[in-house]
């Protein structure tokens, strides 16, 4: 029990969090692996021949170890070994990738997803692990709404609308218990 820290083979911080009674409990974080490399030469590029070096050979070795601050990869809370509350995942550049909400290890609440450019690509809601209510997807390049549909107890239900990437309506369909009823457009 207590704080546990794990590290990558290069000794960079990998995870940190708390255990209570042998299970994860409280805030946990996972970090991206830090990059360390060797430079053979004066140009700062690994494995290249440098014109300023003697006889154009790899005759010097430098170890470059940047002063990294660990970059978050994933962060959230555990309660009795289960994910609980908001969990956020990040791209390596620090931008948000996902925000997922949990209760006792099950999706519960709004789930949001972004692409590497920062555009939201999907948003959906869950209640007790089942998709419930509105689900919206967006075009990755523009962030313009692409599709919208509804779910009840994890099954597609009601109107489904799809748009072109210029925002114009493409088609609409109606679903009952996950089955398409008819094409409206």
Predicted regions and their residues:
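Glycine/tyrosine- and acidic-biased, solvent-exposed loop/turn segments at the edges of beta-strands
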Residues: 1-44, 51-185
